[in-house]
Design a protein with these regions (language model features):
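Glycine-rich beta->alpha junctions and the first turn(s) of the following alpha-helix
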Residues: 192-280
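A short, Trp-centered hydrophobic/proline-enriched beta-strand micro-motif
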Residues: 48, 111-121
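A structural signal for short hydrophobic beta-strand segments in well-ordered beta-sheet cores
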Residues: 135-138
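Amphipathic, small/basic residue-rich leader segments at the start of a protein or domain
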Residues: 1-83, 104
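C-terminal helix-coil-helix/basic helical segment that borders enzyme active sites and/or dimer interfaces
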Residues: 22-28, 258-266, 279-299
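A short core secondary-structure module
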Residues: 144, 148-189
Length: 299
């Protein structure tokens, strides 16, 4: 199936189940139920993020951005989860993890509640790659790995797993390099955060104080000095996905404003012009990312 056919099929599904005339229309500001999210994923939503060897599609940056744009057009929760599981789980997982671990995690993504990448912490700076990151792991004498982490997570409060970013600790010395660890649900204690501003997502503080198998470690590089650069690449690439996400959301806002507001009122015309201006800027950024960024190379 070529890109045009794939995107048309996805758009047809979105319109049928989430469009203006659908009885199941999703709210832009309400959390997307897990059964509906799984149904959407079954349409191949995440396959552009997945390498061909695991059943994905030919790498195509425009296709990635179009999927995010389409999802954004039909709801914040949909495009948010698409970006989370695509750019922050599937892409780093399939690039850095061993095949056995990849094959263990992918069914949780495509047939379960999925997961996410846990980076930011409540007890340190909000910067994703801050020197102050407190989460760490230690390789134990028995070969297992001890993980101590406290992370924010936005998605569905508690998913089937988290990919946890942490520093390696050797004795009392905390290393500078960052690696990832696959932590299943049973090792995680979580406390939901309720906020009127977070209706589209479920936010929580997740705490991990557990011993996990050594094979759950995902090294970002065999060379410790390069692991931070690889981690930065994950973070930057995920931020590039925001351009497709927000472009779809802006399109939705523009469509509804033009449809329902009385444009003959002067200040309304001014606001419409402002939205038009922002949509034009968004389109420039969108086209730039589609045409200049590689879907596979470091950014």
């Amino acid at each position: 199936m070529n890109t045009k056919e794939f995107l048309n099929n996805l758009k047809t599904f979105f319109e049928k189940y989430l469009g203006e005339n659908s009885s199941e229309k999703a709210s832009l500001l309400e959390y997307l139920p897990e059964d509906k999210w799984l149904e959407i994923k079954n349409q191949g939503l995440l396959t552009p993020f997945l390498p061909e060897e695991y059943g994905g599609r030919v790498p195509n940056q425009t296709e990635l951005q179009e999927v995010l744009r389409l999802a954004g057009h039909y709801g914040v929760p949909i495009t948010l989860r698409t970006g989370i599981e695509g750019a922050l789980v599937i892409q780093p997982l399939t690039k850095h993890a061993k095949k056995e671990l990849i094959e263990k995690i992918l069914p949780l993504v495509f047939k379960g509640e999925g997961g996410g990448l846990a980076i930011t912490e409540p007890d340190s700076s909000g910067s994703a790659i801050a020197k102050e990151m407190l989460s760490y792991y230690e390789v134990l004498e028995n070969g297992n790995i001890y993980v101590n982490a406290k992370k924010y997570w936005q998605g569905n409060s508690q998913s089937d797993f988290l990919i946890v970013a942490a520093k390696e600790k050797n004795g009392k010395k905390m290393g500078k390099s960052i690696n990832l660890l696959f932590v299943p649900r049973e090792y995680i204690t979580f406390t939901p955060i309720k906020s009127e501003g977070l209706k589209a997502v479920r936010y929580a503080v997740n705490e991990i104080d557990a011993e996990i198998p050594a094979e759950n470690l995902i090294l970002l590089s065999e060379l410790p000095r390069k692991s931070l650069r690889e981690f930065q690449n994950i973070f930057i690439r995920s931020r590039l996905q925001l351009i497709g996400m927000t472009h779809g959301i802006i399109e939705n806002i523009h469509m509804n404003v033009a449809k329902y507001l009385r444009s003959k009122i002067e200040f309304i015309r001014h606001e419409l012009a402002e939205i038009d201006s922002r949509q034009a800027v968004s389109k420039v950024l969108y086209d730039f990312v589609c045409n200049t960024i590689s879907p596979t190379k470091s950014v």
